[in-house]
C-alpha cells in the first residue's frame, strides 16, 4: 500500500482507477478517526514523487510494482477516479475533511478514552472532578468580574444629584400636603378627581425613578467614589431607606376598586419619602449664600404644614361628630355661607392657628373627645412652637452677631478717643473709616476666617484671589511658582481713607504695596501738587524691600504717596519677602539683578559700590550678630552651670540629712543582730 500513490505531476493524465485492498477496513478506520491506508507513509510517498520528478522513466513504476506483487486479490475492488482524488497531493485523508468533523472526532476520542481510563483508574476520576470544580470556580470568578463592571455613577456632591433632589422633593411635598387634605375634604377629592389621579401617578413614576437613581448614586470608600454596580445596589439594599422606599410604592391604589374613589387616605404610605425632602433642604442650606434667611423660611414652612395638618384633623373630627351639633365643631354646612369648600378650609386653618399658637379665642369644647383633642393640640403647640421660636431667635441673634461685634469695636474706639481728648475732626475720620468698612463688607478678618482650612486649600484660595495681582509686579514676573505661592500667602490687605499718606519721602522702606482698588497720587512736599495718579494694579516700593547695594536712595522712600479716596492695598513686608527667599536663593539673586537693572535705567545705582563685592557694612552687621549670639550662648551656659551647681549642693545636703536620720536606726539593727550571737559564743563547726 505504500506505493499506491497517484502521480499528479502530469496535467494531461486522466483520472485513473486505483485498486484499494480491503476497502471496508479502510472506511471503518476513517470513520474511527484513524489514519487511512491511502497515506500510511507520507514520507515514502513524497520520496517517490521526488524520484518521479527527477526520472521521467519512473512514471510507470506504480503499475509495474503493483503487478510485481502479484496483482489484485479476490477482495480487491476497483474504485472510480472520483474516490481516487481522495489521496491527491500526497496528503492524508484527514487533512481533506472539514475542521468541524476533525473536532468532533477528537472529542469522541477523548470521551471514549476518558471513559476507559475512568473505569480503570479511580484516581483519574478524582482528578477529573477537581479539574471540573476548578473550571466552575473560574467561571464563577469571571461572572463576578463581569458583575463588578463600572456603571455611570451620580456624584452625591455634584449639581446633577442636587437637581434631582429638587425634582423628587416636589412630589414629596405634594403628597405631604394634599393627601391629608383630600382625605378630610370630600369635595376637594371628588371635584378634581382626574387631576389628582394624574398627579398621583406622575409622582409614583418619579418615586420609581428615584429608586433607580439611588442605585446609581456613588459613595466614598477610602476617599474614592465607588462605581461598581453590585456594591452600589448592595449599599442601597442594606439601608433602611430602601425598605421605606419599597413601602412607599406598595400599590395601595388597588383598594380604590373595592372602597371607591373617595378614600385617598390609602395613599398615606407615599409620605415615607420624607428623607429626600429633608436632604434637599440640608444641601440647600450649605449651598446658599444666605443660610440664615433659608433657615427661617424653612421653619416657617414647617409651621404652616403642622397648622395645615391640624386644620384637616379638626374638620374630620367635626364631620365625625356632626356639623353644627355644638358650638365647638364646624358650623352646619347646609348654611350657604359655610357650605363652600374655600370657607371650610379657611375656617379650619384659622381655628388650627389660634389653637396651636396658644392664643385661644376659640369656642370652648363641649364633648369629652373635643376636650382631649384640644388638650393634645395645646401640648403640641407648646412643644413645637417653643423649639421653633427658640431656633428663630438664635438665628436672628446670629445674623446680628457680626453687626454687634463691629459696633462694640466702634464704641470702644469712641471711648478711647474721648478719654484721650482726640480732636473732633480725627474722630469723624475714624468713624467714616469704620462706616466705609461696614458698608463695603470689608470687616472680615481673612486670617481668622481661613485659619480653619488646611494649608493647601488656604493656598489655593490665596492664589485665586492674589496671584494675578502679584504677577503684575515687574520683579516677580519670571519668578518660580513656588515662590509666588509663598508670597501670595504673606500679602496683607490694608484700607486707607481719603487724605492718608501711604509713605513719605525719606521714610525707611519696609513694605511694598499693590493697589487692589482705589486711586493714589504721587504728590509734592506741600501735599497738594499731584505728579502722577496710580490706579488699580499699580505697585510701588518693590526696590526698597530688596535692599540692593549701590542704591543712591539707600533704603528710603523717594516720593510722597497719598490716597485720594478710599483705597484697598495689598502689603508685602521686607521680612516676609526675605523669609520666603531663604528657600529660593536663585530667585533672590535674580530679583537683585532685576532691581539693579531698574535702578540703572533710572540712574539711581552706583556701579562701583554694586560691583565692589560684599558690603563691609553687611560684614560688620554679621559680626555683631555673631558676637551677640555668642554672648547669649555664654550667658545661657553660665546660667545652666549655676543651676547645676546649686542642684548638686542641694543633693549633698539631702544626702547628709538622710545619713543622719538612718545612722541610729542602722546602729540599733546591728546591735540587735550581734547581741544574741555574742551570748551564744562561737559555734563548733565539727
UniProtKB/Swiss-Prot annotation:
Annotated segments matching region C-linker: 401-477
Matching Pfam families = CLZ, cNMP_binding, Ion_trans
Annotated region (Ion conduction pathway) at 291-399
Where, in residue ranges, is this chain on the Cytoplasmic side?
Answer: 1-165, 219-243, 287-293, 401-686
Region of interest (Selectivity filter), ranges: 358-361
Q: How is its activity regulated?
A: Channel opening is activated by cGMP and at a much lesser extent by cAMP. Ca(2+) binding concominantly blocks monovalent cation currents. Inhibited by L-cis-diltiazem.
Cellular localization per UniProt: Cell membrane
Q: Which residues lie on this side of the membrane: Extracellular?
A: 188-197, 263-267, 318-340
Topology in membrane: Multi-pass membrane protein
Q: Which SUPFAM superfamilies match?
A: cAMP-binding domain-like, Voltage-gated potassium channels
Q: Which domain of life is it from?
A: Eukaryota
| Subunit (UniProt) | Forms heterotetrameric channels composed of CNGA1 and CNGB1 subunits with 3:1 stoichiometry. May also form cyclic nucleotide-activated homotetrameric channels, that are efficiently activated by saturating cGMP, but poorly activated by saturating cAMP compared to the heterotetramer with CNGB1. The channel binds Ca(2+)-bound CALM1 via CaM1 and CaM2 regions of the CNGB1 subunit; this interaction modulates the affinity of the channel for cNMPs in response to intracellular Ca(2+) levels.
Linked disorder reads: Retinitis pigmentosa 49: A retinal dystrophy belonging to the group of pigmentary retinopathies. Retinitis pigmentosa is characterized by retinal pigment deposits visible on fundus examination and primary loss of rod photoreceptor cells followed by secondary loss of cone photoreceptors. Patients typically have night vision blindness and loss of midperipheral visual field. As their condition progresses, they lose their far peripheral visual field and eventually central vision as well.
Q: What name goes with this protein? A: Cyclic nucleotide-gated channel alpha-1
**Source organism:** Homo sapiens
Its encoding gene is what? Answer: CNGA1
Amino acid at each position: 500500500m505504500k506505493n499506491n500513490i497517484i502521480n499528479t505531476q502530469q496535467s494531461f493524465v486522466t483520472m485513473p482507477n486505483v485498486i484499494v485492498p480491503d476497502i471496508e477496513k479502510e472506511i471503518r478506520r476513517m470513520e474511527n478517526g484513524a489514519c487511512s491506508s491511502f497515506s500510511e507513509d507520507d514520507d515514502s510517498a513524497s520520496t517517490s514523487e521526488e524520484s518521479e520528478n527527477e526520472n521521467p522513466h519512473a512514471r510507470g513504476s506504480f503499475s509495474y510494482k503493483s503487478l510485481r506483487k502479484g496483482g489484485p486479490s479476490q477482495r480487491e475492488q476497483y474504485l472510480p477516479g472520483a474516490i481516487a482524488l481522495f489521496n491527491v497531493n500526497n496528503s492524508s485523508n484527514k487533512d481533506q475533511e472539514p475542521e468541524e468533523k476533525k473536532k468532533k472526532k477528537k472529542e469522541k476520542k477523548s470521551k471514549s478514552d476518558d471513559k476507559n481510563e475512568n473505569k480503570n483508574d479511580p484516581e483519574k476520576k478524582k482528578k477529573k472532578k477537581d479539574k471540573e470544580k476548578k473550571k466552575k470556580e473560574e467561571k464563577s470568578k469571571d461572572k463576578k468580574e463581569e458583575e463588578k463592571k463600572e456603571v455611570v455613577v451620580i456624584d452625591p456632591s455634584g449639581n446633577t444629584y442636587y437637581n434631582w433632589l429638587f425634582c423628587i422633593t416636589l412630589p414629596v411635598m405634594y403628597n405631604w400636603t394634599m393627601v391629608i387634605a383630600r382625605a378630610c375634604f370630600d369635595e376637594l377629592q371628588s371635584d378634581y378627581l382626574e387631576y389628582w389621579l394624574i398627579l398621583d401617578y406622575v409622582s409614583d413614576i418619579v418615586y420609581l425613578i428615584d429608586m433607580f437613581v439611588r442605585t446609581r448614586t456613588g459613595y466614598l470608600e477610602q476617599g474614592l467614589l465607588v462605581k461598581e454596580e453590585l456594591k452600589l445596589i448592595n449599599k442601597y439594599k442594606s439601608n433602611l431607606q430602601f425598605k421605606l422606599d419599597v413601602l412607599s410604592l406598595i400599590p395601595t391604589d388597588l383598594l380604590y376598586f373595592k372602597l371607591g374613589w373617595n378614600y385617598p387616605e390609602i395613599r398615606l404610605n407615599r409620605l415615607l419619602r420624607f428623607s429626600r425632602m429633608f436632604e434637599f433642604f440640608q444641601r440647600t442650606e450649605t449651598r446658599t449664600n444666605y443660610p440664615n434667611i433659608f433657615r427661617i423660611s424653612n421653619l416657617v414652612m414647617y409651621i404652616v404644614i403642622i397648622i395645615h395638618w391640624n386644620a384637616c384633623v379638626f374638620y374630620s373630627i367635626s364631620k365625625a361628630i356632626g356639623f353644627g351639633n355644638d358650638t365647638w365643631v364646624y358650623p352646619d354646612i347646609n348654611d350657604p355661607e359655610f357650605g363652600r369648600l374655600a370657607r371650610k378650609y379657611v375656617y379650619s386653618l384659622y381655628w388650627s392657628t389660634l389653637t396651636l399658637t396658644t392664643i385661644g379665642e376659640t369656642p370652648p369644647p363641649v364633648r369629652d373627645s373635643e376636650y382631649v383633642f384640644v388638650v393634645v393640640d395645646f401640648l403640641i403647640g407648646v412643644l413645637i412652637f417653643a423649639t421653633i421660636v427658640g431656633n428663630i431667635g438664635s438665628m436672628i441673634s446670629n445674623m446680628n452677631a457680626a453687626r454687634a461685634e463691629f459696633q462694640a469695636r466702634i464704641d470702644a474706639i469712641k471711648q478711647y478717643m474721648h478719654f484721650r481728648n482726640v480732636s473732633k475732626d480725627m474722630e469723624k475720620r475714624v468713624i467714616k473709616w469704620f462706616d466705609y468698612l461696614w458698608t463695603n463688607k470689608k470687616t472680615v478678618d481673612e486670617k481668622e476666617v481661613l485659619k480653619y482650612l488646611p494649608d493647601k486649600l488656604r493656598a489655593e484660595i490665596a492664589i485665586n484671589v492674589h496671584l494675578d495681582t502679584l504677577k503684575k509686579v515687574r520683579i516677580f514676573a519670571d519668578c518660580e511658582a513656588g515662590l509666588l505661592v509663598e508670597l501670595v500667602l504673606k500679602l496683607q490687605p490694608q484700607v486707607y481713607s481719603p487724605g492718608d499718606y501711604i509713605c513719605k519721602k525719606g521714610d525707611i522702606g519696609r513694605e511694598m504695596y499693590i493697589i487692589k482698588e482705589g486711586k493714589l497720587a504721587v504728590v509734592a512736599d506741600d501735599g497738594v501738587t499731584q505728579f502722577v495718579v496710580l490706579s488699580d494694579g499699580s505697585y510701588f516700593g518693590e526696590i526698597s524691600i530688596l535692599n540692593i547695594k549701590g542704591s543712591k536712595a539707600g533704603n528710603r522712600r523717594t516720593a510722597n504717596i497719598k490716597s485720594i479716596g478710599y483705597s484697598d492695598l495689598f502689603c508685602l513686608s521686607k521680612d516676609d519677602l526675605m523669609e520666603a527667599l531663604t528657600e529660593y536663593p536663585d530667585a533672590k539673586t535674580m530679583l537683585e539683578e532685576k532691581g539693579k537693572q531698574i535702578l540703572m535705567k533710572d540712574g539711581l545705582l552706583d556701579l562701583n559700590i554694586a560691583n565692589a563685592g560684599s558690603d563691609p557694612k553687611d560684614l560688620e552687621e554679621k559680626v555683631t550678630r555673631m558676637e551677640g549670639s555668642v554672648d547669649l550662648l555664654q550667658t545661657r551656659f553660665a546660667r545652666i552651670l549655676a543651676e547645676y551647681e546649686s542642684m548638686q549642693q542641694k543633693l549633698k545636703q539631702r544626702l547628709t540629712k538622710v545619713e543622719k536620720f538612718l545612722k541610729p536606726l542602722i546602729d540599733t539593727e546591728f546591735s540587735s543582730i550581734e547581741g544574741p550571737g555574742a551570748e551564744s559564743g562561737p559555734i563548733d563547726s565539727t
